[in-house]
Amino acid sequence: MAPGLTQTADAMSTVTITKPSLPSVQDSDRAYVTFLAGNGDYVKGVVGLAKGLRKVKSAYPLVVAMLPDVPEEHRRILVDQGCIVREIEPVYPPENQTQFAMAYYVINYSKLRIWKFVEYSKMIYLDGDIQVYENIDHLFDLPDGYLYAVMDCFCEKTWSHTPQYKIRYCQQCPDKVQWPKAELGEPPALYFNAGMFLYEPNLETYEDLLRTLKITPPTPFAEQDFLNMYFKKIYKPIPLVYNLVLAMLWRHPENVELGKVKVVHYCAAGSKPWRYTGKEANMEREDIKMLVKKWWDIYDDESLDYKKPVTVVDTEVDLVNLKPFITALTEAGRLNYVTAPSAA
C-alpha cells in the first residue's frame, strides 16, 4: 500500500488520502476527462471546470469526450480554453424504451468510450456540472488496479424505485437503519456516484464493457448503475470531499465539513449555476447560494482564461510576418538600422 493511504478492514470505510510531500506532476500520461453532448448550455459547465482546474494549478490537461452533435462554435470555445477535444460515437443501451430516472440519462452510456483513451495511464472523470475548488492531482498516485469514487446517497426521491429508499437505508449513515437481512437478504454492494471517478483506460476493459452492455438490461440510473455493477469488485470508496453531491447538505449535514470540500457536484435539481434561479426546493439555502456564487466567481474570472504558451516557433513566425513591413519601411527611407555593438 502506498504511503499516505490507509484502509480499514471495514468494507464501509473509505480510503484515507493524504497529499504526498513530493507529488509526481511531470507525468504526461495522466489527464482529467469530462463528457459533452448536444448544443445546449452544458458547455458553460465544461468551461467553468477548465478554469477551475487552472485556478487550483492542476498539472494535467482536461480532455473533453464529445458526441458529434456538439456544434463547432462550442468546440472552438473549449479549444480556446485549453481543452483537448476528442469526438466519440454514441453508445446506446439495448432497449431505448427503458424508463430512466431522467430522460437524458440514455446518452450517458457514451461515457464508456473514455476507457479507450489508452494514451493515458490514469484519468479522473468529472461531470460537466462539477467544480474543483482544491487541487486533487494527488489522487493519481493512489494504487493501481482499482476504481476510486465517492459513495452515493439514496435519500432523494429519484431513488424511490429502490429498496434502500423504501426502508430509509442509506450507506452514508448505515447505523441509522439496519439492513433487514431476514427479509431482503445480503445488503447491496457499495454504490458510487459516477459523476467523479479515478480509473485506468484499457482496451480490453473497453471492449468488455461494450460486450457486457449488450446483454445487460438498462436500469433507471443508466451508466451509473452499469458501472457500479461492472466494477463492484474493484471499487474503493474515497472521502466525501472529492465529490460533494449537494443533497448531502440537507440529507446528511453531519457528514459534511463544507470548508474542507475539494470538489462540488451541482447535480441537485435547480443547482446548476448557469441555470440557477433559486426557486427549486432547497435552492434558497445560504450554503447553496454561496456555492453558486463561488462557481460564478471562477467562470467570470478572465485571468483564468487559457493563455497559449509562447514558443520559439511562434516567435519565429512573428518575425517572418514582420519582414514585409520592415522591408517596406526601409524602402521608404523611414527606418534606419543601427549596428549593435559586439558582445565580445
UniProtKB/Swiss-Prot annotation:
Location(s) in or outside the cell: Cytoplasm
Active site per database record: K111
InterPro entries given in the database record: Glyco_trans_8, GNT1/Glycosyltrans_8, Nucleotide-diphossugar_trans
Tissue expr: Accumulates in mature seeds. Expressed in seedlings (axes and cotyledons), meristems, vascular tissues and emerging lateral roots. Present in abscission zones.
Highest taxon above the source species: Eukaryota
Sequence positions that bind Mn(2+): D127, D129, H265
Cofactor: a divalent metal cation
Gene3D superfamilies: Spore Coat Polysaccharide Biosynthesis Protein SpsA, Chain A (3.90.550.10)
Main subcellular localisation: cytoplasm
Transmembrane parts of this sequence: none
Keyword Glycosyltransferase: yes
Keyword DNA damage in record: no
Pfam family, one: Glyco_transf_8
Keyword terms, alphabetized: Carbohydrate metabolism, Cytoplasm, Galactose metabolism, Glycosyltransferase, Manganese, Metal-binding, Transferase
GO MF assignments: inositol 3-alpha-galactosyltransferase activity; metal ion binding
Single biological process term from Gene Ontology: response to salt stress
Top EC category: transferase
Family statement: Belongs to the glycosyltransferase 8 family. Galactosyltransferase subfamily.
Function, in words: Galactinol synthase involved in the biosynthesis of raffinose family oligosaccharides (RFOs) that function as osmoprotectants. Promotes plant stress tolerance such as heat, chilling, salinity and methylviologen (MV), a superoxide radical generating drug, by mediating raffinose accumulation, an osmoprotective substance.
Protein name per UniProt: Galactinol synthase 1
Organism: Arabidopsis thaliana (Mouse-ear cress)
Name of the gene this protein is made from: GOLS1
